[in-house]
């Protein structure tokens, strides 16, 4: 009797499959479809964690969250939701995901030639500032803190970095079709 957990199928089996048949049943289709995904997954996993000179190591659940998010990204998933309780290190998890994306040069073109552009969106300025400070291991010119007041002054959104930090309200700082703020 055999069960395919991915296809949710069950059926009688007359003979045991050979190791090669098992491999093909398990990974064959996925290998041909997700070869690119496998290459990106390998790049992500080869990029070491930023450990702050050995003073920080991810907890097991943080490592699982980072790994699962990067696997989903490598497979081309556009929406990924991580839900964790207060005090579990969501900012540290986000930092490590961004660290690996940045250093593997992952981007939407998936060409590995250009640094990614990443938006860290928070609901309060204090959280955006906290995240901006937590990302201090990155080169200074990679980080940009976007404030609504700066957009109003300059009339445009800064584009001179790779990792941008702001709050939701920043997107409401422009003018409507009538020119009203």
Residue ranges and their predicted role:
Residues 141-147:
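Acidic/polar loop patches that form or flank catalytic/metal-binding clefts of enzymes
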Residues 173-175:
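Short, solvent-exposed loop/turn elements at domain surfaces
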Residues 122:
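Short beta-strand/turn micro-motifs composed of small residues
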Residues 149-164:
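Conserved motor-coupling elements within RecA-like helicase/translocase cores
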Residues 1-117, 126, 130-141, 159-163, ...:
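ATP-dependent helicase/translocase motor core
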């Amino acid at each position: 009797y055999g069960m395919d957990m991915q296809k949710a199928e069950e059926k009688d089996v007359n003979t045991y499959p050979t190791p090669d048949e098992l491999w093909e049943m398990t990974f064959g289709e996925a290998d041909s479809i997700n070869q690119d995904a496998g290459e990106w997954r390998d790049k992500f996993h080869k990029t070491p964690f930023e450990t702050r000179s050995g003073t920080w190591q991810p907890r097991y659940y943080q490592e699982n969250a980072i790994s699962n998010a990067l696997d989903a990204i490598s497979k081309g998933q556009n929406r990924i939701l991580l839900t964790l309780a207060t005090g579990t290190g969501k900012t540290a998890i986000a930092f490590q995901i961004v660290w690996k994306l940045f250093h593997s040069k992952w981007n939407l073109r998936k060409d590995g030639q250009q640094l990614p552009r990443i938006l860290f969106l928070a609901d309060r300025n204090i959280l955006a500032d906290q995240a901006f400070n937590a990302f201090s291991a990155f080169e200074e010119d990679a980080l940009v803190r976007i404030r609504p007041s700066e957009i109003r002054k300059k009339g445009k959104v800064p584009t001179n970095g790779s990792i941008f930090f702001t709050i939701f309200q920043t997107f409401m700082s422009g003018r409507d079709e009538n020119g009203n703020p």
